[in-house]
Swiss-Prot record:
It is found in: Cytoplasm. The keyword Signal does not apply. This is Putative pre-16S rRNA nuclease. One of its GO terms (cellular component) is cytosol. The lineage of its organism: Bacteria, Bacillati, Bacillota, Bacilli, Lactobacillales. Its main location: cytoplasm. It comes from the Bacteria. The keyword Cytoplasm applies. It comes from Lactobacillus delbrueckii subsp. bulgaricus (strain ATCC BAA-365 / Lb-18). Gene3D superfamilies: YqgF/RNase H-like domain. Its EC number is 3.1.-.-. InterPro entries: RNaseH-like_sf, YqgF, YqgF/RNaseH-like_dom, YqgF/RNaseH-like_dom_sf. It is an enzyme of class 3 (hydrolase). GO terms for molecular function: nuclease activity.
Amino acid sequence: MRLLGLDVGSKTIGVAVSDPLGITAQAVMTIPIDEDRHNFGMRSLKKLVREYEANGFVLGLPKNMDGTAGRSVSRSKAMGERLEQKFGLPVYYDDERLTTVASERILVEEAGMHDRRQRKEVVDQMAAVLILQNYLDLQRKE
């Protein structure tokens, strides 16, 4: 089962894809969005669903550190509903607490990306990888 992992933000969506066996996640791209113009990246996502023959989506659920729903939870849930309606594929959610912080740390410490502008281009993709990989790991444990 091949899944697309999404890190949904206010201006971009980071995208990752699982391998066909559902073991590893790899970064794919960052899709610009414009909520004010109702551009939610569906055209790009449609191409990715076809290209990777995706069977579903995993979206990050931005909870607060105490486990309560963060302000952006409604954005992720609304995107999940749009995806279900548009593609008819299942949408799963995974706790995304600290994925952006972890992504920044990985990019600086392991990839040597000290330029903030350079990191900005890939941090959403890395967050999507962490969201999807966490989901895949949890599924294998069950």
